C-alpha cells in the first residue's frame, strides 16, 4: 500500500476493516457457544453468569486489544511496520536473550495460522446443519459439514499462488457489511432486555470469577480469551494499512462486536430451556437470527470466515519471510504473484498450512472440539509480546514506574489467560502446542546453529582480499586460461570490508583457475529497517575486483541477480569498472556480459572440530538446510547460472 493510502481516509478505513479484523471479527461465531458449553449447556447458566461473562468478554477486548494493542503497541513500529519480529528488531541490541521471546512468540503465531482457518470455517458451515431448504435438509450430518469445510479450505489454499490482489479489493466492503450485520442483529436482540448493559460495569466480570455459579472458576478465561484472538493482527498488519486507519476503524469494529455479544447474552437469558433441533451443541450466534435470514447469515459468515483465514495465511507468509530475513528460519522459495508491494506466496508454507489445517479439521471433526485447542498458543505469543514491549518502553525512557506497572499488569493478565487455557491441553490444546513447539524447535536450531557456525568460521583461516587483487587482476587478463564467465559472482561474507574465507579464493585460484573479466564478492546484510535497498562498493583500486555490500530490509526481496545487474550498469556508466561490450548478442547495444554465481556451503565432515551439543546443533542445522529450498533460491538466483560448492566446516 502506498503512503497516501496509509493516511486516514474513507478508503483506508475500509481497507483496514477488510484486512485487519477478519480473525477477531469472526469470534462472535464461537465465543458464547464455548462459554455456555463449558458450563454444561444453556440449562446450567443464570442471569448473573451471563452478565458476568459478557462483562469479561468486553473488558478482555478492551484491555488486551484496545489498550495494549491499539493504544500502546501501535506506537512501537519499525518504520511503520509492526508485529513481533519488527518489535524484536527494535530492541534486540538491549539483550541477547530477547531473541527467545521473539522465537517463541513467532512460533506460536504461526501455529495459530493452522488453527484459525479450521475453527472459523467449520463453525460457519455448521450453521447449515439441520437447516431446511426447499423442503429438505441438504446438510443433515457433521460428516457433510466436514466435507464442505475441507472443500472450501482446499479451494482457498489452491488459489494462493494466483495472488489475492483482485479479490482482496472486495474484502473491505464485505467485512463492513459483516460488522454492520453483527451490530444490527445484536441491537435487535438487545431490545428484548436492555438491562444487559449492566455488563459494561467491570464489577460483574470480577464477581463472576469468584461466583459459586461459575463452575469453571478462573478457567472460564480460556473461553473468554477467544474473544480477543486476532488482536495480534492489528499490530502485525499496521504496515499494510497504516496506524491511523487502524485507530480510526477500531471503534466501529469494537462497537459492532460489543452489540453482538450483548444480543447473544439477551437471547440466552430469554431462552433458558432451548434445545437445538439437531441435538448438537447450541450456538447462540445462529439461534438469535430469525429463520428467514439464517441462510443469508450463514453465507455471510462463511465469506467472513474465508476472509479471516486468508488474512492468517497471508500473515503467515509475511511472518516466515521476516523470520528468514532475521535468520530464524531457512531461506525459502518466495513467489511474487502480484505487483502489489508486500504480497508474497511461499509454496512450501502454503502446502504445510494446508495439510495441517485439513488434518486438524479431520482430527477434531467439530468446531466445539477445535475450540478446545484454540487460543492456547496465542496466549503464549501475547505474553512474549508483552515482554518485548516492556523492553521497548524502557528503551524509550518511559518512566520506570509506569513501565513496571505495564509489565506487571499485562504480564499477570497474559499469565492468567495462559494458565486458564492450559486446561485445554488434554482436550486438544496439545495439538497447538505441538505445532508451535515444532516450529519453535526449527527456529532455535537454525538460529543457534548459525551462531555456532559463525563462531567457528571466525576462528578459521581468513585472508585479506586486498592482498590478492593483483593476482586476480592478472588472472583476469591471462589469455592462457579460458574465460569462465564475464562476471564471476561469489556470495561471500566479506568481513570488515577486507577479510574473506580462504576457501573462496582457493575456489578461484587453486581448484581450477577461473578467469573472469570481473570478480564480484557479494555480502547480503539484513537491516532493521524493513524496506532498505542500498549498497556500498569497494574496488581496492582495481577495475576487476569488486566487493559489494548489499543492505536489504528484513522485508525486502533478496533478488541478488536483479540488484547485481543494475549495479554493474551503474559502475560501468561511471567508469568504476571496465566496459563489457558484447560482440555476439540478440540485444543491440548490450553493454553487460554474462554472469556466473557461486555459493559456498558448509558441510559436516569427520575433520569438523565439534563435540557434544554444538555438533548436534550444527548437524541439525545442516539437515534443515538440505531439506529447505535450493540455496540458489535463497538469493533469488533460481534462473541464473549458479554453482553450489561444498566445503567441510573445520
From Swiss-Prot:
Establish whether keyword Transmembrane helix is in the entry.
yes
The organism is Lactobacillus acidophilus (strain ATCC 700396 / NCK56 / N2 / NCFM)
Q: Does the keyword Transport apply?
A: yes
Per UniProt, what is the membrane topology? Multi-pass membrane protein
The record's similarity note reads: Belongs to the HAK/KUP transporter (TC 2.A.72) family.
Name by which UniProt lists this protein: Probable potassium transport system protein Kup 1
The record describes the protein's role as: Transport of potassium into the cell. Likely operates as a K(+):H(+) symporter.
Where is this protein found? Cell membrane
Known Pfam families for this protein? Answer: K_trans (PF02705), K_trans_C (PF22776)
**InterPro entries in the record:** K+_transporter, K_trans_C, K_trans_N, Kup
The GO cellular component terms are:
plasma membrane
Q: One MF term from GO for this chain? A: symporter activity
Its recorded reaction(s) are: K(+)(in) + H(+)(in) = K(+)(out) + H(+)(out)
Q: Which UniProt keywords apply?
A: Cell membrane, Ion transport, Membrane, Potassium, Potassium transport, Symport, Transmembrane, Transmembrane helix, Transport
TM spans (from-to): 12-32, 54-74, 97-117, 139-159, 170-190, 216-236, 249-269, 295-315, 344-364, 375-395, 400-420, 428-448
Q: What is its main location?
A: membrane
